[in-house]
Amino acid sequence: MSISLQNINNLIDQDVQRFILECDVQYYKSLQTVVDTIISVQPQKPIILLSGPSGASKTTTALMIEGILDNLSITTHSLSLDNYFISFTKEQVELALNGKIDLESPCRLDIPFLNDQLIKMINGESVALPKYDFKKDQRILTNRILTRIPNDIVIIEGTHALNPDVISIPREKVFKIYVDVQQSVIFDNCTLRPPMIRLVRRMIRDKRYRNRSVQKTFEMFTNCLLYTS
């Protein structure tokens, strides 16, 4: 499946807001079948694990599913695995900047803490949700308290969300989703394939939200592909 860059630019030149809206509507429609399946397995599977490679729009997909379910009066909470990263020391920050720490490894996650919170969510216990500050490379507990009540759904999204070495909650409580980029972009007799589209997305995200230069993201991407391709 592919689309030409010229066609994309023509649609943007005609009406950029309409183009964005039509893309969103098309993706919403593709998610509707997934949402129907999620609803069919409730309340037995209150935890949705959503995974995919870096730059595959995991966060966007989770938020869209949350929005659809909320509009159906099914309270849904989207949480990112990124917020369960272990804080870095100053020494580790320097090592990471020099490419000597694998930032995509599941070992970056506080696995016991994560699973403890997930079990509490399943049981309806209150948890104080963490937040990872990528500019400071530190995790903090926020004032956001989550107490899942019966029929509430929790979406956990992240690269390692489907990794059994990371999340070990009972399988019968879990609904699994995997997302990835499938479309290529063609321009000047070249083809921008899904992995490179994901790289472009990641460069934009890292620059805006993670205090990371385009060059640094590019240097990291080969390492990232070991886990996400």
Predicted regions and their residues:
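Hydrophobic anchor at the beta1->P-loop junction of P-loop NTPases
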Residues: L50
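Hydrophobic positions on the alpha1 helix immediately C-terminal to the Walker A/P-loop
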Residues: T61
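Short beta-strand-centered segment that lines the nucleotide-binding/catalytic pocket of NTP-utilizing
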Residues: L72-F88
